[in-house]
Amino acid sequence: MNRRHLLAAAPAILAASRLRAADSVSSPALVVKAHKYRIGVSTYSFWHFDEGSEKWRSIEKCLEAAAEMGFDGVEILQVQMTDTSPAALRNIKRRAFTLGLDLMGFSTHQTFLTPDPDKRADNILKTTQLLEQAYDLGIPTIRVNTGRWGTSKNFDDLMKNRGIEPRLAGYTDEDGFKWVIDSFQKLVPEAEKRGVIMGLENHWGLGITAEGVMKVVDAVKSPWLQVTLDTGNFLEDPYDRLKQLAPHTVLLQAKTYYGGGLWYSLDLDYARIATIMRESGYTGYLSLEMEGKEDPLTAVPKSLELLRKHFS
C-alpha cells in the first residue's frame, strides 16, 4: 500500500481499532446483562368476553386503564371491537400513541380445521382482512389459531374436557394438519405483504400440544408464521412444553388467575418461565391475560407487579 492509500485508509483503520477495543470492553457486559422486558396487557384482561356488559367493551377505555396502570403496550382482542371501520382504527391508533402505548398484539380467531374447502377459504379471506386491520393499526403481530373440530357443545364444555374434543367422524389429525398447513401457506404472502407476523398459539384444536404447533410452523417454513406462546394453555407439565416453543415465540401471553380462574387456575412459576424465555433468547413483549374473577382494577395491577418482579 503506497503512502496516499495508507493515508486514505487511516480513518477506517482507526475506527476499526476503536470498535475492536470497545468490543473487548463491552462484550462481557452484554453477555451477563439481563434483558428488561416490555410488558403489555390484553384488552381481554378487562372484558373477558362479557357480551352482556359494556363496562370494559370500549377499546379506548382499556387503553386509558393500561396507561394509568403503567403498562408499556396493549394487545387488542379483535372480537371485542365494536367498530372496525378505517376511521375507528385510526382513532384507536391515535389514542394509543397519545397515551404513550405501543399497540403490540392483535388476538384474532379463525378455524381451518374443517373438511369444507369453502369454509377454509372463508377463513383465509377473514384472516387476510384481520392482517389488514393489524397493518392499519400499526400492530406487528397477530395471534392465529388452527381452529377446533367443533364437536364440543360450547367453550365451557371444551374447558370441562380440559381442551380435548373428539375429531369429526371419518377424519384424522393428519387430515386436519393438511388443511391447516395449506391454509397458512396461502396466508404467508398476505402477512409478508403487510409486514405482520402471524403467531400460531398453543390454543386448543391441533395447537393443544407443542408438537402440534411446531408441526404446522415447521411445515410452513416462513418467518411470517411463528408462535404466540400462552403460559396458561398447557394444563399438565407446562414448563418443558413452554421451553419447546420459546425459541420460535414472537409474543408471550402471560396468564394470571386472581380471584380464581374463569374456567381453571394454574399455579405458574413465573421465575422459572422468565428463565426459560431468557435462555431461549426471547426479547419481545409480554402480554398479560388476567383470566381471574377478581375485579380487573385490582387484579391487573397485581399481575403487572408480579410480571415486573420476574421479567425486569
Predicted features and spans:
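Acidic-and-aromatic substrate-binding clefts and catalytic sites of carbohydrate-active enzymes
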Residues: H48-K55, L77-A88, T111-P115, G150-K153, ...
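A structural motif
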Residues: F71, I139, T249, Y282-T283
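Acidic/histidine-rich catalytic cores of soluble enzymes
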Residues: G73-V74, L103-F106, D173-T275
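A short helix->loop->beta-strand "cap" motif at the edges of active sites that frequently abuts
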Residues: L101, V196, S280-G284
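Charged, glycine/proline-rich intrinsically disordered loops and linkers
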Residues: N154-T172
